[in-house]
């Protein structure tokens, strides 16, 4: 099968959809969104796609919505040079960061590049073909193979399938409410 950069096609012998791009970005959180904008700016002729496990951008800032969630870094540091943080509070809450990311996504027309509900199952490099093959599972259970010359991992460091449940001595004796950001 010939490499058809940017084209989606059905592979002849399987029921797996396939897509080829120059760069595949894994994760549509702050890192993935930032990489997409930099890629468009620095390499405008390169095709790219973003695979996002969830049905929304934002990563941490979308997943964790407990009361009082905020950045522990100022947004002048955490934000992007190409889209300076202009809000009054430098230590931003989660909803403000989500608004910032949505504004960037809209301004740079990134929506059409994002493949929502795609959980990456594997990534393998072929030296013979000089490209990556990434297999992802969609929310309906179907699978898609994506081929790319480069893969950028911006998926963060949380294990969404098995969040860490710290066993803290005496926690059960607490009279206050115990909150875990992933439970």
Explain the meaning of each model-derived region.
Residues 6, 10, 79-88, 93, ...:
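Glycine-rich dinucleotide-binding loop and its adjacent helix/turn
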Residues 18-21, 147-149, 176:
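Active-site acidic short loop of glycosyltransferases
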Residues 58, 62-79, 88-96:
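Glycine-rich phosphate-binding loop and adjoining beta1-alpha1-beta2 segment
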Residues 37-38, 62-63, 163-167:
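Short amphipathic alpha-helical segments
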Residues 20-50:
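N-terminal Rossmann-like FAD-binding beta1-loop-alpha1 element of flavoenzymes
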Residues 40-66:
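Glycine-rich FAD pyrophosphate-binding loop
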Residues 88-160:
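Feature captures the FAD/FMN-dependent oxidoreductase FAD-binding
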Residues 1-19:
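Basic/polar N-terminal segments that are highly enriched at the extreme N-terminus
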């Amino acid at each position: 099968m010939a490499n058809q950069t940017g084209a989606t096609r059905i592979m002849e012998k399987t029921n797996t959809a396939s897509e080829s791009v120059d760069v595949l970005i894994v994760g549509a959180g702050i890192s993935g969104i930032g990489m997409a904008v930099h890629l468009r700016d620095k390499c405008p002729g390169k095709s790219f796609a973003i695979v996002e496990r969830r049905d929304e951008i934002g990563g941490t800032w979308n997943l964790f919505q407990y009361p009082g969630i905020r950045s522990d870094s100022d947004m002048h540091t955490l934000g992007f040079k190409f889209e300076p943080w202009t809000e009054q509070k430098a230590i931003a809450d989660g909803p403000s960061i989500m608004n910032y990311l949505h504004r960037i996504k809209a301004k740079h027309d990134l929506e059409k590049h994002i493949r929502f509900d795609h959980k990456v199952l594997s990534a393998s490099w072929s030296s013979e073909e000089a490209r990556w093959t990434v297999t992802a599972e969609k929310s309906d259970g179907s699978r898609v193979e994506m081929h790319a010359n480069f893969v950028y991992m911006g998926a963060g460091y949380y294990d969404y399938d098995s969040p860490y449940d710290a066993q803290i001595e005496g926690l059960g004796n607490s009279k206050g409410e115990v909150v875990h950001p992933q439970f």
